[in-house]
Design a protein with these regions (language model features):
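Short, glycine-/small-residue-rich phosphate/pyrophosphate-handling segment
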Residues: 103-145
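N-terminal beta1-alpha1-beta2 submodule of the flavodoxin-like/Rossmannoid cofactor-binding fold
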Residues: 1-97
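Acidic, glycine-rich active-site loops and adjacent beta-strand->loop/helix elements
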Residues: 42, 78, 112-115, 148
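Short, intrinsically disordered, mixed-charge
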Residues: 92-99, 129-133
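Glycine-rich phosphate/pyrophosphate-binding loop and the adjoining helix
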Residues: 1, 46, 137-149
Length: 149
């Protein structure tokens, strides 16, 4: 059975992104194994860590989880027309050390939500741009934006 990792871009307890992700997980569980990949415990990325023989435990756990799934669903809110800092940090952590990216050749669906009328379009676009650089193949159509949520 295929395995899908779900990353919630908000680290706020009881966030709407978390609720959306939980509902998506319930739907997906019918066809695939689902694993939530936590990002709240990731220390802020620092390139000095790349030179360490032993990486922070949260980095190791996160990278192993990303490498262990066949595809990803990233559910993100929008903060000031951009992805949340915690999500950008997770993308950076998974991409390092150089040449050892956990993201390489993964497939992903990006879902965004926001209380505004643009429904997280800015955040989703930003996430997709970073994922493209990381060699993650995003699902282009259909797009999933939840406005005024």
């Amino acid at each position: 059975m295929k395995k899908v990792g779900i990353i919630v871009g908000s680290i706020r307890k009881n966030s709407l992104s978390g609720l959306v992700a939980a509902n998506l997980a319930n739907v997906l569980k019918k066809d695939v194994e689902v694993e939530f990949i936590e990002i709240a415990d990731l220390p802020l990325y620092n390139q000095d860590y790349d030179a360490l023989e032993v990486q922070p435990a949260a980095y190791t756990r996160f990278r192993k989880q990303v490498k262990g799934v066949d595809g990803l669903v990233i559910v993100t809110p929008e903060h000031n027309r951009a992805m949340p800092a915690a999500l950008k940090n997770a993308l950076d952590v998974g991409s390092r050390p150089w040449g050892q990216s956990a993201w390489n050749n993964k497939k992903a669906l990006v879902v965004s939500q926001s209380p505004g009328k643009l429904s997280g379009f800015g955040a989703a676009t930003q996430v997709k741009n970073v994922l493209a650089f990381l060699n993650v193949h995003t699902i282009a159509q259909p797009e999933a934006y939840l406005a005024e949520s």
